[in-house]
Amino acid sequence: MDFYKRLRDRAAILLLSVLLASCATQPERRPPSVAVQNQIVRLMPSGVTDARGWAADIDTALAAQDIPATTQNICAIVAVTEQESGFKPHPMVPGLAKIARRELERRAAARHIPAFVVDAALAVQSPDGRSYGERLKDVRTEEELSALFEDFIGMVPLGKRLFSSFNPVDTGGPMQVSIAFAEAHDQDYPYPVDGSIRNEVFSRRGGMYFGIAHLLGYPTHYHRIIYRFADFNAGWYASRNAALQNAISVASGMPLALDGDLVRYGSDEPGATERAVRSLRDKLDMTNEEIHDTLEQGETYEFQASPLYKRIYELADRIAGKPLPRAVLPGIKLESPKITHNLTTAWFAKRVSERFWRCMPPASS
């Protein structure tokens, strides 16, 4: 009996130790909070339909990602959502059907698919009795267009082989987040997935979750939030990397586009930024391979602790005679079939920043 008692006691102690270790290494995330949701509602623009529902989705996203529900974070979310969709979960896009048809034809031409093949595919009858071409004429939202193309690709003959990359909708939801980003960051998604992550992006809850992840789910050293807004549009750390490109240009004497892209992705050939850094390799005491490998880390926070990053600024600051900025607004022209005006990342960031400061209480500004 003593043997079994000692065995039970040891098992109990072991179980308690495991539980305590679990608590120590995995602190509980805060649950959604009515108080936080009340604050979100107060900071949202007046006239938002179902403000309580929006607040609940925002609160859940913040809690699930361990992002503090500060006034600044909430106002950043509000500002981006207001800019991107006006707090409409399924915003209508004027002229979307024509835009989509032009984009489909452009992609077909790029793949050397004859126009008659596209026309024949669009003439195929879809499950609702209409042809895909007829349905395309009626689309009003990106969600409708994305669903149409997913159906189209799966149903028409050779659809996956010919048209697998033809879905023109690569962003969606009320924060217009990249679907590729969402698919790469779905590990802790707190909701049951309705079919696919693409579908979830077009839901209010999913669009807000992934949009908030893209906006606030990474550390930065920025002293002004406008750079985070620019990154939301141009990609994580684009503002930091654009500033580095400016420093590289000063140090090397080679003019560079300040677009935040440090390497030429999808190519073995070095881009302009990498060539400029290579011209400094003796001063940096680095090989071309070391330079390339380091620049490839440019989408990480740790990149700014690299010897390359520090040495470039040492050189550039000395030449400039003053510390150069560590963040600048990227000079990127916005490219999208939906955009009909000459807009830039800087324009986007400034517009969102204006909305942000209107949201922030007067004492905070």
Cite the ranges covered by each PLM segment:
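Cell-wall glycan-active module
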Residues: 1-9, 15-365
